[in-house]
Amino acid sequence: MDRDEIKSAIEAILFAWSDPLSIKDLSEVLDIGTKEIEGVLAEMINEFNYSKRGIQIIKMNDYYQLSTRPEHYEYLQKLFAPKQNRGITQAALETLAIIAYKQPITKTEIEEIRGVKCDKAISTLLEKELIEEQGRLEKTGRPIIYGTTINFLKVFSISSLDNLPNVSDFNISVDSDILKDIYEK
């Protein structure tokens, strides 16, 4: 890979992962030495800053993450401001069902089941206090694990997760692999 391809790959990895990644993790994924990764990241940080892009690469100890630039906070705040009386989308409902049946579960595992990104759905569910962060996995990147809340039980009038209906009881026509993924524990 040439240097531009390495930069492109690092940007894609940091974007897709969303949590901080170490140089060691990037080195293993790209099969490139840590010193070269470190040099490329330093160049990328300078390039992102010089071109005043909307995103930046931030360094936290030996970890790196993509982040929006602080000067765009007011725009993002408007975008993500809680909206009153907003319903729940089909995507959020699907995400909630997966979390309810598979918890504790990571965002990546949810996305593998759904086949699409779920950032907005998770954000909505957190905002409505139907799910919560229940910690982090002790593996590379330390991904957040999600589970349902007491509010989830209250909203859906169930006393415990043991009272969730069996997925096989639903008369739904979905890809049987998806149904199997959700139901298998």
UniProtKB/Swiss-Prot annotation:
GO terms for biological process: cell division; chromosome separation; DNA replication. GO terms for cellular component: cytoplasm. It holds the Pfam family SMC_ScpB. Gene3D superfamilies: Winged helix-like DNA-binding domain superfamily/Winged helix DNA-binding domain (1.10.10.10). It is found in: Cytoplasm. Keywords: Cell cycle, Cell division, Chromosome partition, Cytoplasm. InterPro entries: ScpB_csome_segregation, WH-like_DNA-bd_sf, WH_DNA-bd_sf. Participates in chromosomal partition during cell division. May act via the formation of a condensin-like complex containing Smc and ScpA that pull DNA away from mid-cell into both cell halves. Homodimer. Homodimerization may be required to stabilize the binding of ScpA to the Smc head domains. Component of a cohesin-like complex composed of ScpA, ScpB and the Smc homodimer, in which ScpA and ScpB bind to the head domain of Smc. The presence of the three proteins is required for the association of the complex with DNA. Belongs to the ScpB family. HAMAP family: ScpB. This is Segregation and condensation protein B. It comes from Alkaliphilus oremlandii (strain OhILAs) (Clostridium oremlandii (strain OhILAs)). The lineage of its organism: Bacteria, Bacillati, Bacillota, Clostridia, Peptostreptococcales. The gene is scpB.
